[in-house]
Amino acid sequence: MNITDFDDIRPYNPDEFLEAMQRIAHSSSFPILSAYVYPEESVKEIRQRIANYQTVREFQQDTMSKVNQQVIENSITEFSCSGLDKLSPEGHYLYVSNHRDIMLDSSLLQYFLLNHGFDTTEITFGANLMSNQLIIDIGKCNKMFKVERPGGSLKEFYRSSRHLSDYIRFVIQEKGQSIWIAQRNGRTKDGNDTTDQGIIKMFCMSCPDDKIKAIDQLHIVPVAISYEWESCDILKTLELYESQFAKYTKKPGEDLNSILTGISQPKGRVHIEICEPNSRMELMKLEQLTSNEYHKAVARLLDERINKAYRLYPNNYIAYDLRYGTRKYQDFYTPQQKEEFLAHVRELEHYDTCDIEMLKDIYLGIYANPVNNK
């Protein structure tokens, strides 16, 4: 395989990167972006800096690191990450992460990797998010590659899945880069982090004759990200509520609204746990399984690591006790923390055209389900 086989989905090459930097620097939205990332510098200075970047690494080390710093300073009280000692800076991994926030799950991991001597990863970039040229340019200059969402005919879905599988294997084995991908299509809305069996099946499509080798060669590393205050918790509650009555249809601009809400909403403490990579030894124990059973078993391996590594906060224990009418976890939070959480729950009362008790139960479930999954 050659990189040109993936021109339709890959990130920008060096020449395309230079052209994109010029477009970003001269876009109509640049003054707004500049003011957020570099509030104390003039637009002219920042425009010149962006236009002069020569490599992705320069862009990520300077501007994207600054973006993450601003997010952390403005909306996170404490950011931590652990588990990097399980990996080698020279290794090429497939980071499979739970997915709670459209942008920050992957972006905060890149920030941590960069600050600890690891190269950043390529990142999956949903085609549905490619709403304009500026977003495409920023994404593809950050090593993002396009992933088509399910839809169309079965034949087309198979073709795009096989193409994605080929690309993932090419990046890790031949290009010598790592990749970040979510454990499922779309974000977790209800607090249950579960790996989609179809994702594992897709990984195996590019090595159909040896299911053990297919997974082992990708060097899968499960990742768990935990937010003290769930990203877009009210928006997720409303979406889950609407889904109770009819198939949910996204509204125009909804993804962008979720991205902006996720960036700006107070998140409290945020922790990323990099789990032990999957080993060939544990995969060999699954050798006698059928392909379908194997895909399910590998997904369970990831779920076990991610759920075990997920960091619980007082909000999770409070929600559990409230939802199930117990005091089981009362030693894990204070009365003040409980009152703060209840104040957030009461915000749902503004949506008086909905069944408020149902809304509250959904909201509590988002926070309580990670406790159930331990």
Give residue ranges: language-model regions:
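General structural signal for secondary-structure boundaries
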Residues: N52, V56, P150, Q197-F203, ...
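Residue-level preference for long, well-ordered alpha-helices that form the structural scaffold
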Residues: V56, E156-S160, S291
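Soluble or luminal CAZymes and related metallo-dependent hydrolases
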Residues: T63, R159-L164, Y294, V298
